[in-house]
Amino acid sequence: MKVKSFAKIDLGYSVYKKRKNITKHDFESIFILVESVYDDIEIIKIDKNVDDVHYYNETNEIYVYSRLVYKTLEWIRQTYRIKNHYRINIKKRIPIGAGLGGGSSNAAVIMKSILELEGIKEINYKDVVNKLGADIPFFLSGYKTAYVSDCGSTLEDLSGQFKLSYEVHLMNVNVNTKLVFEKFDDNQWHVIKNNFKTIIKNLKENIVTNIYNDLQEHCFELYPNIRYKYNELLREGFYTILSGAGSSFICIKLKDKENQVIHEN
């Protein structure tokens, strides 16, 4: 089975402080699938007692260790009592550490494909979030745009409800998401600025304003070169927001231009 594993961008990102005995941050965001940026994944049933995962660029095999992919394979096997094993070939195009959900997309596509091959249709999103990750349910959902909350397990389909013209600006920086969240946690004072009900209403009326990413300033503190690029994009006239923990930007522009992806060398 051959499948595409698409990237996503986060339009606005509100992060809530962790509550006692809760290991994950609750958040709100609008996730948008980016179908022009994707990894190619091939899934082959093999006659072995272990799974075999390989990563490639356009020409060669490369070393990438994704704990999430192996964790997903283990979760599938334990949850659904699957006995078959698989070789997974992943041709990487989604940049690593770019805030585009590449690892989660890979995990979701692998999960969905293997369950399809095994004839299994039911997936518990809350269990996926608790055991694997908050971005995975979006990639499982089939939605092109969604309002996401409840640690990623609750999704409201917004596909086709507004038209947004944007560029995705990819920087050649691998951001450490864990460090960005640690910076966020160290900050004692935090005010939620986004009102997603208003943001969604405005987007449907072609109004883009008052959209914030709570991780943006913490990313900039750790990576000053990303802040520099942000200021440069602002000077070019874009409404610019960091995607996730970084390093990619969503640059919103005039709606009569085509969406595109720009790579920073």
Curated annotation (Swiss-Prot):
Keywords: ATP-binding, Isoprene biosynthesis, Kinase, Nucleotide-binding, Transferase. It catalyses: 4-CDP-2-C-methyl-D-erythritol + ATP = 4-CDP-2-C-methyl-D-erythritol 2-phosphate + ADP + H(+). The keyword Transferase applies. InterPro entries: GHMP_kinase_C_sf (IPR036554), GHMP_kinase_N_dom (IPR006204), IspE (IPR004424), Ribosomal_Su5_D2-typ_SF (IPR020568), Ribsml_uS5_D2-typ_fold_subgr (IPR014721). It comes from the Bacteria. ATP binds at P95, I96, G97, A98, G99, L100, G101, G102, G103, S104, S105. The active site is at K8, D135. SUPFAM superfamilies: GHMP Kinase, C-terminal domain, Ribosomal protein S5 domain 2-like. Belongs to the GHMP kinase family. IspE subfamily. PANTHER family: 4-DIPHOSPHOCYTIDYL-2-C-METHYL-D-ERYTHRITOL KINASE, CHLOROPLASTIC (PTHR43527:SF2). NCBIfam families: PRK05905.1. This is 4-diphosphocytidyl-2-C-methyl-D-erythritol kinase.
